[in-house]
């Protein structure tokens, strides 16, 4: 596996590249041009600018997260053709710059949803939290206004001001969009962009819906093993693949993440590893990466990646906010660094076990 770390950019991310360089084993940064609105083309000049910044610290820029999909594409509007052309041109420019994987999602309106960005934990840290009853019983416009106030100055990906400013219009537009419609619009998008991605040497890696169920009446389709299989069959091409986020899919107790890794491993081009703890009422909180701290068996998930000889990209996903760090919700330096060390510790242990079985450590 190739370890990476998500970075929001110079003068934007409070974590400088020189700090990330000090985390053992990190080979690349996961990046994006967050200031460019969805639907606009990324220029070669802007892409090369980030590459140069990363190169100063010997980081690769192989993985982009995300090139956001314009809502008109998800809605299947006639204007989608313009935005798809821009998307294709962005992929061509990224391919020329050596980008290998592009993460994206097809969630209507906004990305991952939580009700509390800084929920106090028993150990004194804070973490992202999802309260089911609150989501089920609040007006989405009011909910998003409350969440924006929690963000402070560090906006979350998928909750950009230009998107939220049109929230009422978007919810109105999605009233008639059911699961089948979203599937059809996704298929159209894939049929258009996957050939371009393949020609550009890029693996497209869709991110699961977070959480993996309908919220506020909006469709969610990348939610489970069966839907992942359906997704991959829409355009059965090696350039059409997955970002497997353990925390997103793992929010649903029916999803067996390790089994999904073993079944679809050859199409998983990007892995997000994090842990969450479920509550009986449908709530969940994010935790440290340690298996015993949450409800997901991170040990077994990492073992599944090791067993399939996973060669692609990994990053620690959302961490807690610890040691009074002032950071973007879920994206602090300290707990994600601890997560990397935990993942590496598990991986190294499985490497030793495998070597022992082969007799390389004198164990017959």
UniProtKB/Swiss-Prot annotation:
Top EC class, one word: lyase
GO molecular-function term, one example from the UniProt record: ferrous iron binding
Catalytic activity: D-mannonate = 2-dehydro-3-deoxy-D-gluconate + H2O
EC number: 4.2.1.8
Pfam hit, one: UxuA
BP term (GO), one: D-glucuronate catabolic process
Keyword Transmembrane helix recorded: no
Gene3D superfamilies membership: Divalent-metal-dependent TIM barrel enzymes
Necessary cofactors: Fe(2+); Mn(2+)
Pathway: Carbohydrate metabolism; pentose and glucuronate interconversion
Keywords tagged on the record: Iron, Lyase, Manganese
Entry-linked InterPro entries: Man_deHydtase, Xyl_isomerase-like_sf
The family this protein is said to belong to: Belongs to the mannonate dehydratase family.
NCBIfam families: PRK03906.1, uxuA
Protein task: Catalyzes the dehydration of D-mannonate.
Protein name: Mannonate dehydratase
Organism in which the protein naturally occurs: Endomicrobium trichonymphae
């Amino acid at each position: 596996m190739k370890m990476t770390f998500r970075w929001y950019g110079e003068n934007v991310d409070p974590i400088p590249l020189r700090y990330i360089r000090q985390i053992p084993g990190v080979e690349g940064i996961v990046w994006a041009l967050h200031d460019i609105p969805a639907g606009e083309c990324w220029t070669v000049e802007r892409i090369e600018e980030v590459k140069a910044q990363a190169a100063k610290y010997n980081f690769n820029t192989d993985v982009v997260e995300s090139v956001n999909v314009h809502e008109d594409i998800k809605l299947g509007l006639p204007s989608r053709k313009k935005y798809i052309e821009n998307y294709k041109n962005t992929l061509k420019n990224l391919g020329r710059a050596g980008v290998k994987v592009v993460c994206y999602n097809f969630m209507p309106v906004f990305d991952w949803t939580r009700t509390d960005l800084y929920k106090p934990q028993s150990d004194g840290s804070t973490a992202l939290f999802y309260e089911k009853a609150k989501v089920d019983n609040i007006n989405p416009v009011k909910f998003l206004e409350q969440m924006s106030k929690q963000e402070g100055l560090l906006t979350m990906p998928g909750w950009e001001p230009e998107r939220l400013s049109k929230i009422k219009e978007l919810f109105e537009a999605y009233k008639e969009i059911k699961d089948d419609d979203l599937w059809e619009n996704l298929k159209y998008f894939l049929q258009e962009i996957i050939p371009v991605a393949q020609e550009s040497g890029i693996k497209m890696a869709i991110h699961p819906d977070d959480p993996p169920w309908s919220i506020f009446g909006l469709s969610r389709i990348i939610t489970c093993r069966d839907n992942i299989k359906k997704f991959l069959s829409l355009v059965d091409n090696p350039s059409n693949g997955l970002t497997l986020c353990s925390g997103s899919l793992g929010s649903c107790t029916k999803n067996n993440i390790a089994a999904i890794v073993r079944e679809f491993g050859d199409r998983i081009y990007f892995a997000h590893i994090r842990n969450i703890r479920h509550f009986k009422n449908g709530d969940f909180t994010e935790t440290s990466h340690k298996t015993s701290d949450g409800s997901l068996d991170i040990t077994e998930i990492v073992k599944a990646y090791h067993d399939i000889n996973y060669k692609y990209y990994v990053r620690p996903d959302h961490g807690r906010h610890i040691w009074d760090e002032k950071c973007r919700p879920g994206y602090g330096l300290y707990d994600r660094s601890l997560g990397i060390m935990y993942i590496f510790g598990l991986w190294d242990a499985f490497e030793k076990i495998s070597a022992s079985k082969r007799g390389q450590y004198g164990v017959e």
